Amino acid sequence: MNATTVRPEIELGPIRPPQRLAPYSYALGAEVKHAETAIIPERSEGDAFGRLILLHDPEGAEAWDGTMRLVAYIQADLDSTEAVDPLLPEVAWSWLVDALEQRAEHVTALGGTVTATTSVRYGDISGPPRAHQLELRASWTATDVELGPHVEAFCEVLEHAAGLPPTGVTDLGSRSRA
């Protein structure tokens, strides 16, 4: 999983995995670097970030339909027009399905949720008065021990959620985040 090459805008590295979900686990954290500085500020959750967790049970789990389960979580800030788009959940889910179909040989038991939220701050709370986020939670079973394509698919979904242009395309304007 660590040998995967991702876009330079994404910082990818190991994080502490959950300890009680399976006999073995490993996790990667990913965050999109801020375009203005090309770094991730120390006190930031980022415009888009996520984690990909590998759970392994050599005896398998019936609900997994296999021995290796991947669990993904992605959160990204949205602007107000994106947040109210009624097709946002379907489009965000299609990013994952398409990325897995293009990169991973075969997956089973794919499931998850897509949530768009709007938060309104009141009183003495710092931050913008309104904030909009997209959350994608998904899990699937890998049928092959080669996990690099799964990491690449996860990072591709993170790229879409962050609004990064496709690889090889230059963004002539910046997308506003509110």
Predicted regions and their residues:
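Short, extreme N-terminal leader segments that mark the start of a protein/domain
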Residues: 1-18
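Short, internal acidic amphipathic alpha-helical interface segments
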Residues: 86-124
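Amphipathic protein-protein interaction modules
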Residues: 111-143
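Glycine-rich, often proline-containing surface loops adjacent to acidic residues and nearby aromatics
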Residues: 25-27, 65-80, 130-140
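Short, conserved charged micro-motifs
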Residues: 37-39, 81-85, 145-150
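A glycine-rich, hydrophobic loop/mini-helix early in the fold
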Residues: 27-75
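Long, low-complexity, Ser/Thr/Gly/Pro-rich intrinsically disordered segments that act as flexible linkers
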Residues: 18-21, 27
